A protein has these predicted regions:
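Active-site environment of divalent metal-dependent phosphoester hydrolases
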Residues: 11-18, 37-39, 67-69, 91-94, ...
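Short, polar loop motifs at secondary-structure junctions
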Residues: 14, 32-39, 47-49, 89-91, ...
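Core dinuclear metal-dependent hydrolase active-site scaffold
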Residues: 1-3, 18, 46-101, 188-195
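Metal-dependent catalytic neighborhoods of phosphoester/phosphodiester hydrolases
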Residues: 18-27, 42-43, 161-168
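Short active-site oxyanion
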Residues: 24-30, 81-83, 178
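Generic structural signal for residues in well-ordered beta-strands
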Residues: 43, 59, 179-181
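Active-site metal-binding motif and surrounding structural segment of the metallo-beta-lactamase
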Residues: 1-35
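Cap/insert and terminal regions of metallo-dependent hydrolase folds
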Residues: 96-184
């Protein structure tokens, strides 16, 4: 499987890049942006917008909006279909068609953020670099199609969002039930056809 030998990385922030040295040590090919390559020279640079074939997968890097250079990915495979992977971004300024799977950031929820800002638990700048649940839902509504098989909410803050409530809100607002959130040990099946 592609993920067993190749690892796309979105940005240089340590919550995303700290495992790059181990990945390289164990022979994985790491792909990312030039910013990551400047810190980890063995990481291969993906050029934004250029489709690349890796094994049975096609992968295309798309620039995202963050405090450092950051990529999301369009990943396609004949058995999985089209996967959109976007994290560490304040918005996703693209429209997609015929997507089977979204792995998309939903870092915080406005009411939780306001409470935590008032209590000085989190800084305002953190919120500016990450997608709020309402923005994630709006993105998913704008990109919804009958091809959709699954949504996985990723990069959820431990303090600024209630994951179970976020999943329920996405289900309610989209009328789509196969919604999960990422957590340690989560395994998801990415099939093109309904499972």
């Amino acid at each position: 499987m592609w993920w067993e030998r190749y690892a796309p990385t979105d940005d240089r922030h340590q919550d995303h890049a700290k495992s790059i040295p181990n990945a390289l040590k164990y022979g994985l090919s790491v792909y990312s942006c030039a910013d990551v390559n400047s810190i980890y020279p063995q990481a291969k640079v993906l050029k934004k917008g250029v489709k690349m074939r890796v094994g049975g997968f096609k992968i295309q890097a798309i620039p995202l909006v963050h405090s450092v250079e950051c990529y999301g990915y369009i990943i396609e495979h004949e058995e999985c279909g089209k996967i959109i992977f976007c994290t560490d971004t304040s918005q996703i300024p693209y429209r997609f068609k015929n997507v089977q799977h979204y792995l998309v950031e939903s870092n915080n929820e406005l009411d939780e953020m306001i409470d935590n800002l008032c209590d000085n638990i989190v800084s305002r700048s953190h919120n500016d670099d990450h997608m709020e649940l309402s923005d994630t839902i709006e993105f998913l509504k704008e990109n919804y199609s009958s091809d959709l098989q699954s949504i996985t909410l990723i990069h959820l803050s431990q303090t600024n969002i209630d994951a179970d409530k976020a999943v329920q809100r996405v289900k309610d607002e989209l009328g789509f039930q196969n919604v999960k959130y990422s957590k340690s040990g989560l395994e998801i099946t990415l099939n093109k056809a309904e499972f």
